[in-house]
């Protein structure tokens, strides 16, 4: 253990020197098939040549300039996002946590400007994850996140996942918004059915409150659409974005309709690094690659191949696996063995997966993973399951 680093992570005894596509390599040259992609961050794999070119080209011109000035790369990326989404405007951050913070501020400022400052309560859901800031952990509400950190930021109402009647019963004169992940990632790859998201949109319209979706993990092509909420045909008022949009470079965003963002005027929010030229140059290239029908269709095709293979593994190893969850390339395997045992045994088979709540192992590969790599991943997952069976 490196004692000079704050021990907030229970790190695996692995260190990587370089990456290429869906592979990570140690200094000894050992290759690991990365089915986690930095927890849905490396949307186009490691060291993608087009992203490297976008980054290095910009690095040779300008790294940072304050948001006191116009930033052409930021303006271009914002235009791309507005042109292809529900949003009318964008604010750039460096992470999903920062995006959550702004979404909370935006919701509350919206009501303050309407003369209804008492409307501060945001409905959130059990199993959710919205980052590790004070607002983020208060929004999620899990004791695992909040224990020991003193009084929580008030104004969050935590409800059971996808219980329409409970949600409507909780809406009152203090309710400002509903905040939800279309697919819970940390919560165990729990997919909100399309009809439920439609129902939330209807509830928000009925009671004149805002709908905010957290697409930090499930957005940027991961489900076969640019954003997961698109499958339901609804438009949120606010969306939080990060992870895949930067392809591995720190970048996040909050997308908003004009009405929802109406309270965010000069001086109400800011970011030193948010929307810097380096990050936005990479983000532009990510969107240009991912947001095409051909690319998004390929995600759906690859999802079908992985899912078919996983179903075969469940049939063959019913003592190890219980069910498959998710959609696109945001998949989860609920295990019967401890999920951490599976992840750790995977290290021995040189495959990287990601644990989640509810004893789930996440598969979040690069969106451009090849068919050959999918077959190799399924083989290594089977080897892992077989080793755990033998060890029983």
State each model region's role.
Residues 1-392:
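Conserved N-terminal phosphate-binding loop of PLP-dependent enzymes in the Aspartate aminotransferase
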């Amino acid at each position: 253990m490196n004692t000079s680093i704050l021990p907030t992570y229970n790190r695996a005894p692995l260190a990587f020197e370089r990456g290429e596509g869906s592979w990570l390599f140690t200094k000894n040259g050992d290759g690991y098939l990365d089915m986690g992609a930095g927890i849905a961050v490396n949307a186009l794999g490691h060291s993608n040549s087009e992203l490297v070119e976008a980054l290095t080209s910009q690095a040779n011109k300008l790294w940072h300039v304050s948001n006191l000035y116009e930033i052409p790369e930021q303006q271009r990326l914002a235009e791309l996002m507005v042109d292809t989404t529900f949003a009318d405007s964008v604010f750039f951050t460096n992470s999903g946590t920062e995006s959550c913070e702004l979404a909370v501020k935006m919701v509350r400022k919206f009501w303050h400007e309407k003369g209804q400052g008492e409307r501060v309560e945001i409905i959130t859901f059990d199993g959710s994850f919205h980052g590790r800031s004070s607002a983020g952990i208060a929004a999620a509400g899990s004791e695992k996140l909040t224990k020991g950190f003193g009084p929580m930021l008030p104004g969050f109402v935590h409800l059971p996942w996808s219980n329409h009647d409970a949600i409507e019963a909780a809406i009152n004169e203090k309710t400002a918004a509903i905040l939800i992940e279309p697919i819970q990632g940390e919560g165990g790859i729990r997919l909100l059915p399309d009809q439920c998201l439609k129902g939330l949109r209807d509830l928000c319209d009925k009671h004149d409150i805002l709908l905010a979706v957290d697409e930090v993990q499930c957005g940027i092509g991961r489900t076969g659409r640019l954003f997961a909420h698109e499958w339901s045909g609804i438009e949120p008022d606010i969306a939080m974005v990060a992870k895949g949009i930067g392809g591995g470079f720190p970048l996040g965003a909050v997308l908003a309709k004009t009405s929802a963002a109406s309270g965010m005027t000069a001086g109400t929010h800011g970011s030193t690094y948010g929307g810097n030229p380096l990050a936005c140059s990479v983000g532009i290239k990510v969107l240009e690659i991912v947001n095409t029908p051909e690319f998004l269709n390929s995600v759906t095709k690859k999802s079908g191949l992985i899912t078919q293979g996983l179903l075969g593994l469940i049939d063959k190893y019913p003592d190890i696996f219980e069910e498959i969850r998710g959609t696109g390339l945001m998949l989860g395997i609920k295990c019967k063995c401890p999920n951490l045992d599976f992840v750790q045994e995977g290290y021995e088979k040189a495959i990287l997966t990601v644990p989640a709540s509810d004893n789930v192992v996440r598969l979040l590969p690069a969106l451009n993973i090849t068919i050959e790599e999918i077959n190799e991943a399924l083989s290594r997952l089977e080897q892992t399951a077989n080793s755990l069976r033998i060890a029983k």
